[in-house]
Regions:
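Conserved, well-structured ligand/cofactor-binding cores
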Residues: 1-477
Length: 477
């Protein structure tokens, strides 16, 4: 991947040697080496704007703290802060070309941010890019920091902001299910267990059930996200705080709280926090739980809409596109299907996060880059999936009310409602005879004079079969 190529270059050097960097690039030699070393995926940092902004926020917090400790000049601080604010405004994001999946525990990403901010700060100070004696990526932008605290802090902030977006999309989807629950509240249908007829319920109860299980996952997701607000900024390399002054961590956290408005806290034990990635493990797991529930719901939607003539056919999903290149007139449930696939991808990403989480060794987990990429990707997939499912499927679902009513009338499952009155033994006989003869339960109960028509109608009223009721009815014999 090549960025900002031009004929003019500037020479930059580091431990490995000197390289020619495009003069038009805000990034420097560290980023250039990262581009060359990590041609791994198509997931690049510039595709994750909230992460880039979180990196800028982290550097702003550090700059404010360093200025208060008189470790940066006022001119350097002002220029660094202005450069970071431009990044927050969406500028310079094309200058973050590195692969999200990289060796080095995130050093390439951290240095990409340091170099972009330093070179833009140099311009604001009236200097040329690369004149690092005036504002250095390492000595000034990265002052009092290590990749091992700045990078995970930025991940936490970026993922928390991503979470805030995700829950809005999620809540809107849940509300769509609630609306369908209200719309279909009057439609009686058969409930099913193990894909066999069970007892009656309403179609509204089905959709409200979907909403309720998702609301529970929304709460769980929000609970897991709170761990992102605890950071290890000030830990530097391994948690001892080497190269940082005693008051730095406290001042940096205060600055981050002010900049973000978030309740950011410093971890109690910086040694432990520096190697601990459990917040990503926990949040990815919460997204996996959402994916599992979405799979169940989408599978149910596909079953409920199966047919159109030889399936359950209780609901109609919006027809989005022809379903077959060979079968004329066939329309498939493509939107629930794509949400299924989104869910499988999220579940797969969670396995990657879990395995990477247990890969920490000693005082650091070098697998944070792929963990972060998986978490950001899963959240993006879910947001897109939620919106697609809501707008192209849920909002347009209609009910086949007569089909639902007819299935209840013909079902043997309604015999369950007779249990409290005529007993399990007699109910079983009625069910068996209905299966053998093809007659309905209603017809057989009257035929055998087990109940009066009035009592039978009372028991089998839809409103009496979809909730707990107390009926004072006795059999004829």
């Amino acid at each position: 991947m090549e960025q900002n190529l031009s004929k003019k270059t500037r020479t930059e050097s580091n431990l490995i040697g000197s390289r020619e960097v495009p003069e038009s690039a805000l990034y420097g030699v560290q980023t250039l080496r990262g581009i060359e070393n990590f041609r791994i995926s198509k997931f690049h940092l510039n595709e994750y704007p909230l992460f880039i902004q979180a990196l800028a926020i982290t550097k702003m917090g550090a700059a404010v703290a360093n200025r208060e400790l008189e470790l940066l000049t006022e001119e350097q601080t002002d220029a660094i802060l202005k450069a970071c604010k431009e990044i927050l405004e969406g500028k310079h994001h094309d200058q973050f070309p590195v692969d999200m999946i990289q060796g080095g525990a995130g050093t390439t990403t951290n240095m990409n941010a340091n170099e972009v901010i330093a070179n833009r700060a140099l311009e604001l100070m009236g200097h040329a890019r690369g004149e690092y004696q005036y504002c250095s990526p390492n000595d000034h932008v990265n002052r009092s920091q290590s990749t091992n605290d700045a990078y995970p802090t930025a991940i936490h902030i970026g993922l928390y902001y991503t979470h805030l977006k995700l829950v809005k999309h999620f809540a809107t989807l849940i509300e769509a299910f609630r609306k369908k629950g209200a719309e279909f509240a009057h439609i009686i249908k058969m409930g099913r267990t193990q894909l066999e007829d069970a007892v009656p319920m309403t179609l509204g109860q089905t959709f409200n059930g979907f909403a309720s299980i998702l609301e529970h996952e929304l709460k769980n997701l929000d609970f897991a996200a709170q761990d992102f607000l605890t950071v290890n900024m000030g830990a530097t390399a391994i948690g001892t705080g080497i190269t940082a002054e005693p008051e730095y961590a406290e001042k940096c956290i205060a600055a981050l709280r002010k900049i973000t408005g978030l309740d950011i806290k410093l971890a109690d034990d910086l040694i432990g926090a520096t190697s601990d990635t459990s917040c990503m493990v926990g949040y990815s797991s919460a997204m996996r739980r959402v994916a599992v529930k979405m799979n169940k719901i989408c599978n149910d939607l596909r079953l409920l809409a199966s047919g159109p003539r030889c399936g359950l056919g209780e609901i109609n999903l919006p027809a989005m596109q022809p379903g077959s290149s060979i079968m004329p007139g066939k329309v498939n449930p493509v939107i629930p299907e794509v949400m299924n696939q989104v869910s499988y991808k999220v579940i797969g990403n969670d396995l990657c996060v879990a395995m990477s989480g247990e890969a920490a060794q000693m005082e650091l987990n070098v697998m944070e880059p792929v963990m972060a990429q998986c978490c950001f990707e899963s959240a993006d997939l879910l947001m897109n999936g939620f919106d697609t499912l809501r707008t192209l499927c849920i909002d347009g679902i209609t009910a086949n009310e007569e089909k639902c009513r007819r299935d209840v009338h013909n079902s043997i499952g309604v015999v369950t409602a007779l249990n409290p009155v005529i007993g399990y033994k007699h109910s079983t006989k009625i069910a068996k005879e209905a299966l053998e003869t093809g007659k309905g339960v209603y017809e057989l109960v009257l035929e055998h004079n087990i109940l009066s028509k009035e009592d039978l109608d009372t028991i089998l009223k839809p409103e009496n079969m979809i909730k707990p009721v107390k009926l004072d009815i006795h059999p004829n014999h």
